[in-house]
Amino acid sequence: GKGCTQGGFFMPENQNMQKTSDNEAMLQEIVQNTEMGKNTLDELMGLTYDQKLKDEMMRQKNEYRRLNQQAHTALDAIGAQAKGQSAAARMSVSMGIRTRTMLDKSTRNLATMLAEGSGQGVLDCKRAETDYPQASPGVHKLMEELCAFQTGAEQAWREFV
């Protein structure tokens, strides 16, 4: 059984390695997820005159920034380099936004897009939870925080639809 190895004292080396790589992988997911959220809000913020929508965008952007910084700090602590979204990924999101807002910059359309994005973010969180089971409790907690935030965000955007 696993009972006696739990202390970490007899933990086989490869299990420790797995824990490190799961920590790093999950933190990278958080970095990319929060970066996409932040960048998307940045881009959409300039398209609306709806002050209530803008206020909600600002609130969420600050939360994405906070979570992003926490993930960066945690990566630094384990000696890993944060890998943000690739330029190609950023470009593709940006093009998608421009295409979908070209003819319709209404609050309803922007809120719909943001709700979809938040929903996708929640799915990405859930996938990461499953993919990196060995991540430490602190890293899992940060991912759960992001997931809870995006679940609430999705609800917030639905109010505007």
List the model feature ranges, each with a label.
Residues Q69-V122:
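Carboxylate-rich helix-loop segments that flank metal/cofactor sites and access channels
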Residues N16-T48, N109-P133:
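Alpha-helical bundle segments that constitute or directly flank the non-heme di-iron/ferroxidase center
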Residues D22-I30, Q51-Q69, T107-L114, S136-Q150:
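Alpha-helical scaffold segments that form or flank carboxylate-/histidine-based iron centers
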